[in-house]
Every structure is written in structure tokens, then in C-alpha cells.
């Protein structure tokens, strides 16, 4: 393992760890560009090198060993990445050979923008993007607008406007002030953290979403998109895979943002991602991947994987089931057909407990009968209901929880949208709940909550029409949900198409 300094286009030396195979070259290469510290990837580099790849991990500009200003998601990631790939091809151990851009989270953004750059020696030959944090706007907000407060506060406190990282910065601040994220306005958070974060306010002005997904439609490079059904960026992973113009493969496992670092309970749900990446990279560089889109999605809780084609929910292997509100076979209203969404007392994202119905309703609560048999879910979920709010702006948050026969609760699906319907007028509200990959055992009941907030995961809508990140005044919002014509829609496996994930992805 050696450390070299790769010159960026403006001459900035980018600190890069390099690990070469023991065998004579030339070697194909793997490039990882990360803001989280290149030294954390040394075991990964050795793994690639053991399989015949020259492996590089680089600190992005302004982070750890690389000097310069640190501006997340700016255009320099593309140009610095291209300069690094071109430098790799100039080395004797490369011989101008193929390069794979690899990355997880922000590093996936770096890999993708490098892969989507102009043709030439600076563009890699394939890309592996895991749990991709695609861009500033993509990470800051949900597709329908609500701000991802706690996740962005945690990331910016840990990594923003500094050359190093303090992963527990937000946790320490919350220990000192448990109500830290409640203080208004949201843009003044750095004052309460006690350090300068000049880029924090601009985060919320970033637009538009989906830039990398749109650019990806013109690419002809092979793509491996890896995500988790519990990852907040799962839908971005799917959108990237669906829209990619070249041979595209999807692996959607039973994981969160840390992927297999959080070990699944069932051994057969586990995948050796390192071995998969090597096998896929070899197939991609050799031109052995079929041109069509292909992927696999977990059936979490079963140890099985379901094969998918052009779109997760297309084809005869799945169908949509409808769970009507207030129907014997659907979802029965427990309470809260009328409720008050009060941002001073918001429904919390970090608490699955629900009120017993003896207090004034702060959400609409529905419950299904027990499942008579196991149910495999593999595809998108949606809540569609008729409702009204008496305020000019309103967020609608829907949380679906699986209750086992003993009553233990486990999150199943979530979605939130922002609406500006005329006050008091009933409207049809559609809330996408993400893509599910799950086996529900017999006896499971589905509990559905419809609320006006999901705090602290999401910033509170003030209900005044003001921007939630600059607002300083909060107002309650009276809500009414109509059961008629309202339902939960789930994609279920109609015809089992079990596959082994690694062979399916590498062909």
C-alpha cells in the first residue's frame, strides 16, 4: 500500500492510496473517491488487489489528506474524477487498461459523475454505485418536497464545512439539548451546534432533483446499482437503475444505508458484496453482460430473492392488491377520521407507539385483520385517500407498520408528500410508500397511520404557507380523512420467480 498524490486539473494534489496486485501488470483498475477518509478503504483495496485489480482510494478535494475547499456535490467532483481516471491510465501498471468507478453513498455520486463525463481517457469503463446519495437536492428533500431534517443535520454536523469528520457530532449536541431540532428557524441550526456551517442554509435551496438520473439515460456504460429496502435513498437507487442507458443490474437487499455492515437475521439474506463486485466487474469489462435491464430484490424474512426485469412491478410475476379503508378485508378505522396535526406536538418518526384513542387524535389510525397466510411483497406500495386540511399548506405522512401475532411492531413502509390544496376542500392524496421486499408471516396485521408530521426525520410543516426551514411561527392544522374510495395498494408476488442474486446479476 502506497500513498500518491494525483494532480487535479488545477494542480491540487489529491491524496490517494494505491494497492497493486502481486502479479505482473498491466492490471484493470478500481477507483474509489470518498469524503469519508481513504484509509477506511484499505482492506477493500487489498481485496480488489488480491483478485488482480489495481485499487485506488482517494480523498476528495478539501477532505482529510487532500487540500482545497470542500463544497459537497459541486462540479469539481466530475473533473477531479476524470483527472484521476486519466492518471490511472497513464501508469505503467495500467497500460491504458480498463477502469471501474466504485462508490457508496457520497462516493457513489463521485463514481457516477465521473462515469457520466465526456468521452476520453477520463471516463471509466463501468460503474458500481451503492446506496447512492445522488446530489444536494436529492438528499435534502423527499421527491414531493418535505425536508429530511435529522439525516441532513447529522451529515452536516459530522462532515460539512470541515476537512475531517466527527460522526457523533449531532448525537453529542442532542445529549446536551434533546430539543435541539425543535428550535426555529431550521436555518439557524449551526448557531445551536456551536460551529460555523456556512453551506447549511444553501442546502435547502438546491434544485432540481434527478439530474444524475436524467444524465444516466444517455450512458452506455455497464452499471451495478446496489441498495437496501431500508435505505432512505432506495428509490433513487431504483430510479438510477430504471433510467440507465447501458446494461444495468440492480441488487436491492434487506439492508439500510450501511448495507451488509448490519447483518441480516437470516443467513441466506446475506451477500458477499466484495465477491459480487469482483465477479460483476470482470463480466462488465469483458462485455459478457446481456444488454437488457435485470435485477433481484430481497424477500426479507424468507431468505429468498425475487428476480425483476425492466421494472420492479412489471410482468406476470407480480400483481397489485388493494386494502380499502374501513372494509372487513382491508383496513378498519380505529380512530382519527378527524384529527389535529399540531407542529408543536408532532407525530414522531422515532417512536412506533400509537395513542390508545382516549386522547384527542393526532393521526388517523387503521388496522387490518391478521393475514390468513404468508404474503410476499416485491414492488411499489402506495396510499391513496381522500382528505382535507384547513390550512393553506399541509404535509401528509403515511406510515405502515407490520404487527406480528404478539403485537410487536416493525416498520414496513413510509412516505410523505407536501400539498397546497384549497383549505377545507377534500382532495385525493397519493402518497408513494417506496419499494418493498418482504415476506410477512401468517397472522401479521398491517397498521396504517396518516399524520401531518414525521419529526424529527422530516422538518415540521408550519401550516402557514411559509418555508419550513425559515419559518418561526407554527400553527395547528385540522384534518379530515374519508374512508370512501381510500385504500392502501401493495405489490405482491403472484408467481414466484426465485433466483440466486450473484449469478443473476452477473449474466
Which residues fall in each region the model found?
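Gly/Ser-rich "nucleophile elbow"/oxyanion-hole loop immediately N-terminal to the catalytic nucleophile
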Residues: 23-24, 69-77, 86-100
Amino acid at each position: 500500500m502506497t500513498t500518491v498524490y494525483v494532480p487535479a486539473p488545477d494542480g491540487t494534489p489529491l491524496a490517494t492510496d494505491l494497492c497493486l496486485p502481486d502479479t505482473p501488470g498491466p492490471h484493470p483498475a478500481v477507483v474509489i473517491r470518498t469524503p469519508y477518509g481513504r484509509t477506511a478503504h484499505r482492506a477493500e483495496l487489498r481485496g480488489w488487489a488480491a483478485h488482480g485489480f489495481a485499487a485506488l482510494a482517494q480523498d476528495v478535494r478539501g477532505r482529510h489528506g487532500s487540500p482545497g475547499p470542500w463544497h459537497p456535490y459541486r462540479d469539481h467532483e466530475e473533473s477531479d474524477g476524470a483527472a484521476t481516471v486519466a492518471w490511472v491510465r497513464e501508469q505503467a501498471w495500467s497500460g491504458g487498461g480498463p477502469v471501474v468507478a466504485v462508490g457508496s453513498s457520497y462516493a457513489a455520486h463521485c463514481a457516477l459523475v465521473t462515469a457520466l463525463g465526456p468521452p476520453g481517457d477520463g471516463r471509466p469503463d463501468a460503474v458500481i454505485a451503492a446506496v447512492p446519495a445522488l446530489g444536494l437536492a436529492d438528499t435534502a428533500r423527499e421527491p414531493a418536497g418535505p425536508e429530511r431534517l435529522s439525516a441532513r443535520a447529522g451529515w452536516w454536523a459530522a462532515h460539512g464545512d470541515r476537512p475531517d469528520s466527527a460522526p457523533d457530532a449531532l448525537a453529542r449536541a442532542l445529549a446536551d439539548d434533546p430539543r435541539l431540532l425543535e428550535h426555529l428557524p431550521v436555518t439557524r441550526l449551526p448557531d445551536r451546534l456551536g460551529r460555523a456551517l456556512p453551506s447549511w442554509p444553501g442546502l435547502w435551496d438546491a434544485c432540481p432533483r434527478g439530474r444524475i438520473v436524467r444524465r444516466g439515460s444517455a450512458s452506455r456504460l455497464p452499471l451495478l446499482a446496489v441498495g437496501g429496502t431500508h435505505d432512505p435513498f432506495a428509490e433513487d437507487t431504483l430510479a438510477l437503475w430504471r433510467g440507465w442507458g447501458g446494461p444495468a443490474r440492480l441488487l436491492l437487499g434487506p439492508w439500510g444505508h450501511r448495507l451488509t455492515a448490519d447483518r441480516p437475521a437470516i443467513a441466506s439474506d446475506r451477500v458477499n458484496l466484495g465477491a459480487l463486485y469482483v465477479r460483476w466487474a470482470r463480466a462488465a469489462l469483458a462485455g459478457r453482460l446481456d444488454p437488457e435491464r435485470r435485477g433481484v430484490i430481497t424477500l426479507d424474512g424468507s431468505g429468498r430473492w425475487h428476480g425483476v426485469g425492466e421494472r420492479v412491478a412489471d410482468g406476470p410475476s407480480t400483481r397489485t392488491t388493494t386494502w380499502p379503508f374501513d372494509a372487513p378485508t382491508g383496513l378498519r378505522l380505529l380512530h382519527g377520521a378527524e384529527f389535529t396535526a399540531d407542529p408543536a406536538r408532532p407525530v414522531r418518526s422515532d417512536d412506533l407507539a400509537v395513542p390508545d384513542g382516549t386522547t384527542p387524535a393526532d393521526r388517523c389510525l387503521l388496522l387490518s385483520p391478521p393475514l390468513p397466510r404468508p404474503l410476499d411483497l416485491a414492488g411499489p406500495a402506495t396510499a391513496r385517500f381522500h382528505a382535507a386540511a384547513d390550512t393553506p399548506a399541509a404535509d401528509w405522512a403515511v406510515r405502515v407498520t407490520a404487527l406480528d401475532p404478539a403485537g410487536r411492531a416493525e416498520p414496513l413502509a413510509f412516505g410523505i408528500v407536501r400539498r397546497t390544496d384549497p383549505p377545507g376542500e377534500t382532495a385525493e392524496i397519493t402518497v408513494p410508500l417506496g419499494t418493498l421486499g418482504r415476506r410477512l408471516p401468517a397472522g401479521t396485521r398491517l397498521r396504517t397511520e396518516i399524520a401531518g408530521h414525521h419529526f424529527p426525520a422530516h422538518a415540521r410543516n408550519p401550516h402557514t404557507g411559509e418555508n419550513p426551514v425559515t419559518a418561526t411561527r407554527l400553527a395547528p392544522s385540522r384534518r379530515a380523512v374519508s374512508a370512501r374510495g381510500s385504500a392502501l395498494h401493495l405489490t405482491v408476488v403472484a408467481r414466484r420467480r426465485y433466483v440466486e442474486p450473484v449469478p443473476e446479476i452477473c449474466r
